[in-house]
Amino acid sequence: MNTMNNMHLYADSLGIHPADHYPTMNEIETTDNTYPRYTSPPHPSILHHPQAPEPAPPRAQTAHPPAWALTSQSGYQMNEPSLSLTPEHRPAAGPPNGPNLNHDSDPRRPARRQQPCGVGTTRPLPGCPGQGQEPSRRRTTFTDSISNPDSTIRCWDHGCEGRKFSSVGNYRRHLREKNGQAKMHPCPDCGRVFTRSTARNFHRQSGTCGLIPSQLMLQMGMGMQLQVQMQPVSQHSLASGHPPAFNLAPPVLLEPLADWSEPSQMDLYAASGVVFD
């Protein structure tokens, strides 16, 4: 204690204030029956150091990831639900544009298709214009004839005036003939041109090859007359069961037996007793 008092007196004589003197860690007051006690004040750096903020508690995991995480993922990864989410926090899957009113809730029933206008409808529909009106009359085209086999195929080109055809092949051949694209089949004997090989072969086999049109018409008329004459005889022979008693020969063209020139007329008159002056 005397030593401490002496040190204070020495400091006062030098003009040093006791507050400016900070004792070191070695200056310790000790008493009997007590523990050592530090008398030096705390360090100024400890007094003026700002207190560090307490760490924030961890945030609870949300059900939706941040926006930057969604943009970095691919399309199929964005559609998949997060595996870390519990079932009760997962969003319910639903249609992107709201509920579909046209879809039937029963999966066992097939989906209904919207029927187009004019197909299988007998009553006029409000959304279909022109329904319930009388259809306009129009000519049947080749496309309509193909789609409807029961309809008659006609050609309405110039000069045909609705000519009928029994099949599509005949109609196409007719178009090729009009356009000059049909294959020609000439007769090697008379040079007559046919558009069908069957017509050319019939022409050669029937004996009409080499005849002029007037002779051909005469032969055709004779054939028709022969058929008319033979028809009742054949019916009578079939009814009686006996063949006809005579054979019918084709008619023969009679050539003129006399020359009707002027001298022949004079001889005819002289033979009858007529005398001319």
UniProtKB/Swiss-Prot annotation:
GO terms for biological process: regulation of translation. GO terms for cellular component: nucleus. Residues 27-37 have a biased composition (Polar residues). One of its GO terms (molecular function) is zinc ion binding. The keyword rRNA processing does not apply. Keywords: Metal-binding, Nucleus, Translation regulation, Zinc, Zinc-finger. Belongs to the GLI C2H2-type zinc-finger protein family. This is C2H2-type zinc-finger transcription factor. It comes from Emericella nidulans (strain FGSC A4 / ATCC 38163 / CBS 112.46 / NRRL 194 / M139). The lineage of its organism: Eukaryota, Fungi, Dikarya, Ascomycota, Pezizomycotina. The gene is scpR.
